[in-house]
Amino acid sequence: MNDLLTIGDKTFRSRLFTGTGKFPNASVMQKALIESGSELSTMALKRVEVNNPEDNILKPIVDAGINLLPNTSGAKNAREAIFAAQLAREALGTNWLKLEIHPDPKYLMPDPIETLTAAEELVKQGFIVLPYCHADPVLCKRLEEVGCAAVMPLGAPIGSNKGIVSRDFLEIIIDQARVPVVVDAGIGAPSHAALAMELGADAVLVNTAIAAARNPIAMATAFKLAVQSGRLAYENGLAAVNTQAVASSPLTAFLD
């Protein structure tokens, strides 16, 4: 499909973004990411040995030609996130950043106040900011207004695999957004990814559902196809939902 997605200064053919955690080893991770067709993969800066060019996490992604999206996972407030972002830019040579601030280690819920504060400052510093946030239409609009290149509202809590629990709010976010909407977190099955795309999301980010699968490489293929299918359905107009039956082949004229 010739259906390109532009975020910031990059254009993507694939609308499936990926994570790098929880894979059994670097080789499986690389093969799965390649099979997924993903062109953007996120990783926590805390997992990268920035002074080691042969880093076991970094090298497979670079060798596969996939764009890096460092994230600030582990940051508990705006100050820590800004510091991590500056380190990532210096070490990895990219101004792209997935902004994550979740002070509660149990539920990993993003802190909306600290996220907005950090986003505003990071945009001023020249970062291309993609903030992970609650599926809050007001917050997403504020993040857009301070200059974020996209918003990344959650479908469900990180790693929960519950799917698109926040559907009603995602629909509002998608409707009013003037920047790309990437549904992030909670996507546990290819059908969840397809649904997000059918709703009009511009992309999805998937990690656990691929990495923790019995066969991550095959699951990556399943997600690739699901995202393509959901996007194609959205682009071509899903049939309207009705509250009563509508015959597909009415016999009225025939019987008359």
Swiss-Prot record:
It holds the Pfam family ThiG. Belongs to the ThiG family. The active site is at K98 (schiff-base intermediate with dxp). It is found in: Cytoplasm. This is Thiazole synthase. It comes from the Bacteria. It comes from Aliivibrio fischeri (strain MJ11). Pathway: Cofactor biosynthesis; thiamine diphosphate biosynthesis. Its EC number is 2.8.1.10. The gene is thiG. 1-deoxy-D-xylulose 5-phosphate binds at G159, A185, G186, N207, T208. One of its GO terms (biological process) is thiamine diphosphate biosynthetic process. GO terms for molecular function: thiazole synthase activity. Homotetramer. Forms heterodimers with either ThiH or ThiS. It is an enzyme of class 2 (transferase). Catalyzes the rearrangement of 1-deoxy-D-xylulose 5-phosphate (DXP) to produce the thiazole phosphate moiety of thiamine. Sulfur is provided by the thiocarboxylate moiety of the carrier protein ThiS. In vitro, sulfur can be provided by H(2)S. Keywords: Cytoplasm, Schiff base, Thiamine biosynthesis, Transferase. The keyword Transferase applies. Its main location: cytoplasm. It catalyses: [ThiS sulfur-carrier protein]-C-terminal-Gly-aminoethanethioate + 2-iminoacetate + 1-deoxy-D-xylulose 5-phosphate = [ThiS sulfur-carrier protein]-C-terminal Gly-Gly + 2-[(2R,5Z)-2-carboxy-4-methylthiazol-5(2H)-ylidene]ethyl phosphate + 2 H2O + H(+). GO terms for cellular component: cytoplasm.
